[in-house]
Amino acid sequence: VAPPQHLCGSHLVDALYLVCGDRGFFYNPKGIVEQCCHRPCNIFDLQNYCN
């Protein structure tokens, strides 16, 4: 598992596409930016935003 990292902007969206794949994701900027851009997050945090 990759170490937690800061993901912001297009990097965050790209990571969501990678993690969620065909399931897609709901983009809630306030929640995910707080969790993954301001603080580092991991793949499990990202999976919480998949549909």
UniProtKB/Swiss-Prot annotation:
PROSITE patterns per UniProt: INSULIN
Any single biological process term in GO: glucose metabolic process
Keyword list, A-Z: Carbohydrate metabolism, Disulfide bond, Glucose metabolism, Hormone, Secreted
InterPro entries named among the record's database cross-references: Insulin (IPR004825), Insulin-like (IPR016179), Insulin-like_sf (IPR036438), Insulin_CS (IPR022353), Insulin_family (IPR022352)
Pfam family name, one: Insulin
Gene Ontology CC annotation, any one: extracellular space
Positions of disulphide bridges: 8-37, 20-50, 36-41
Subcellular location(s) per record: Secreted
Ranges in a coiled coil: none
One annotated GO molecular function: hormone activity
Family: Belongs to the insulin family.
Protein's job: Insulin decreases blood glucose concentration. It increases cell permeability to monosaccharides, amino acids and fatty acids. It accelerates glycolysis, the pentose phosphate cycle, and glycogen synthesis in liver.
Quaternary structure, from the entry: Heterodimer of a B chain and an A chain linked by two disulfide bonds.
Protein name: Insulin
Organism: Pagrus major
